[in-house]
Curated annotation (Swiss-Prot):
The protein's name: Mitochondrial outer membrane protein porin
Residues bearing PTM Blocked amino end (Met): M1
Protein's GO biological process: regulation of monoatomic ion transmembrane transport
GO molecular function: porin activity; voltage-gated monoatomic anion channel activity; voltage-gated monoatomic ion channel activity
Gene3D superfamilies membership: Porin
Principal location class: mitochondrion
Subcellular location: Mitochondrion outer membrane
Described function: Forms a channel of about 1,7 nM through the cell membrane that allows diffusion of small hydrophilic molecules. The channel adopts an open conformation at low or zero membrane potential and a closed conformation at potentials above 20 mv. The open state has a weak anion selectivity whereas the closed state is cation-selective.
């Protein structure tokens, strides 16, 4: 798991490649109220139906600091909760998590000016920590490390992001322990048309072809857009997104395995409602 602030370094391209591609039939509804909200999700997959409900409560007026808590239960029997409090001191945020599998963690995020630091501790005595630094508007760097109770490093990553122009974003991630290098880029060609891609090279298996994703997005108008992507396994995802308002969003997806076109076609749809 990458701590949130470290993962934010590569978020522009990651979101472009991963978000708004519907491969299942999903209804995500948020009911807002005076003291918080309730999020209900129903996801219909080939393996069955998974439903979850998540009440969220706002404790800001009781604690005097921006804070909230939520509890999630799903039909697979998973129960988990989270409590967040911000600005314990200026720039410091704390997040506590727990679930029915007896996994507990506490995360501290500190973000101020050009520096972001995260420390993530688990009840199994493992840890995850990261440091990100904005050198200037063009360059950012970050390092992330994961270890266990025996003071053994399990993972070390480093990231460099480059924004040479407002319309170009590039990130380079070196996964030292896994011996992998990930290169990603996002290019905004016009106000309507954008392109993105990522490629992962496995240095442990130089004979293996790199894995990749290539995607594009076209804004039809202020409310709708088209997205498409293809990966190294020749899987194609095409998506139509329509925002009827700030409270309603529809995503229609067509997913094709070009290696087996007759049997590799699936469709999906996602509906996001805020009431």
């Amino acid at each position: 798991m990458n701590p949130g602030l470290y993962a934010d370094l590569t978020k522009p391209t990651a979101d472009f490649i991963k978000k708004d591609f519907a491969e299942t039939f999903k209804l995500d509804t948020t009911f807002k109220g005076k003291y918080g909200s309730i999020v209900a999700v129903t996801d219909i997959k080939d393996s069955g139906v998974v439903a979850s409900i998540q009440p969220k409560a706002d404790f800001t007026k009781y604690l005097g600091k921006v804070s909230n808590g939520n509890f999630t239960v799903d039909t697979n029997g998973v129960k988990k909760g989270e409590f967040t409090i911000e600005n314990i001191i200026p720039g410091l945020k704390a997040v506590a998590n727990g679930d029915s599998k007896q996994n507990f963690s506490t995360e501290f995020q500190y973000k101020k000016d050009k520096i972001a630091f995260t420390l993530f501790g688990h009840n199994n005595k493992s840890f995850n920590t990261s440091l990100a630094f904005l050198i200037n508007p063009t360059f950012s760097v970050g390092v992330q490390a994961e270890g266990n109770a025996k003071n053994t490093l399990k993972n070390v990553n480093a990231t460099i992001t480059i924004r040479p122009r407002p319309d170009v974003f590039v990130s380079i991630v070196d996964r030292f322990m896994d011996k992998q290098i990930l290169l990603s880029t996002l290019y905004t060609a016009t106000s309507k048309l954008s392109f993105a891609g990522d490629v992962t090279v496995d240095l442990k298996a130089s004979e293996k072809a790199p894995s990749f994703n290539v995607g594009t997005q076209y804004k039809i108008d202020s409310a709708s857009l088209l997205k498409a992507k293809v990966n190294n396994n020749r899987k194609v995802n095409i998506s139509y997104i329509y925002n009827t308002s700030n409270n309603t969003k529809f995503v229609l997806g067509w997913n094709v395995n070009t290696k087996n076109f007759k049997q590799g076609n699936t469709f999906g749809a996602t509906v996001n409602l805020t009431l």
